[in-house]
């Protein structure tokens, strides 16, 4: 994906921003670095460094892809036994999304994947240093700062508590979301127009209706299955990731934009899930459930790619999410896909 040409949704926006981004020599001129434009400092510095090398946006894509996938596959090599299964699931389910849709946030996700072992081992100094780096790429990483507080509660739950504790936490946090955003907007997000708009969109968003909640819970069945098995195996680090994934998914049902917090836990979830569904003992006892969970996981991602693209007027009936990836063009066969270009314009 690093060599793609005009493929992806947010990628096209970042390419537009990059066209008028400053290089390093321009960035450090007095008054040139404008934090109010919304991008976090390390992302701005990253763009400037790439701009210093070349004006071609492909350099941003290449570095982004190298860092993100390098971290994901390096950690998979250390953590995952069934690596090929993980690669297949990642490639078909989330590879386009992480590499083209959330370029800034994907770097923060990579930082969290690297830093999670420090959280598990209680090395909070290193963990928080990595969290600061993640936050400097994407503001949503501020959420990672509270994970050490939540770890004792969400890594030891057993039985029905494994499902109840994340629900209670999520409902309490959802109740105070407006208060939390107000504090952030008056401190860390002060004078940042982009983050102010994002906060406003969160508060104005509507949650899922009953049918939406039921559908979302059905799509989370693979997660529930992993939670059930992890309780029996007693691995705290796995149980915490699964509970956090459930926790942010519930918040996302109340405030839809906040469902993106789940991005931080998707890859670690796939690490766990890839080994779990091929464990001989688990297959022997739960093969029908494993098969059902795989089908639901595939369905949930397929439904995402087949849904109409979001616009100011709701979901489009003309353009679908897969239109931003298909057909694929690389820098070696540069071609503008007019349908994709129109679809992206619809979102502005």
Language model feature labels by segment:
Residues 73-93:
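Transmembrane-helix signature of polytopic, membrane-embedded enzymes
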Residues 112-126:
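Membrane-interface transmembrane helices that cradle and orient dolichyl/undecaprenyl
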Residues 95, 126-150, 246-253:
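Membrane-interface alpha helices of multi-pass inner-membrane proteins
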Residues 41, 53-70:
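Loop-to-helix entry region of an early transmembrane alpha helix in multi-pass inner-membrane enzymes
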Residues 12-15, 21-28, 148-265, 309-330, ...:
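Alpha-helical transmembrane segments and terminal signal-anchor/GPI-anchor hydrophobic tails
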Residues 12-20, 33-55:
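Short hydrophobic/aromatic helix or loop-helix immediately within or flanking a transmembrane segment
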Residues 165-169, 282-303:
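Signature aromatic-anchored transmembrane alpha helix within multi-pass, membrane-resident enzymes
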Residues 100-106:
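Short acidic/glycine- and proline-prone juxtamembrane loop motifs at membrane-interface regions
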